[in-house]
Amino acid sequence: MKLVTAIIKPFKLDEVREALSGIGVQGITVTEVKGFGRQKGHTELYRGAEYVVDFLPKVKIEAAVADELVDRVIEAIESGARTGKIGDGKIFVYDLQQVVRIRTGETGAEAL
């Protein structure tokens, strides 16, 4: 089992969600986050004063999936999130030691 985490542009969330649903991902967790990488920040004008916005709004998507689904999940996220411009995001894949469905007590792949 793996936890696939992606940091993407907020306006690409619907496309990514649809792509993941299309390959059978049954649930995701979405968190609004801020960060910067190569994209860096930008300068804004507020009440006549310029200031630098260092952290840009992003969306973090997390999906716990079976090992055999990981490559398809990565492809779905890439296709849904890609604009071809700096700041499209990153995908991280982590091993999951254990998963437990609290309601039923199911564990492992059955809990996904």
Q: Where do the protein language model's features map onto the residues?
A:
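Positively charged, small/polar-rich N-terminal and surface patches that mediate targeting and assembly
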Residues: M1-L112
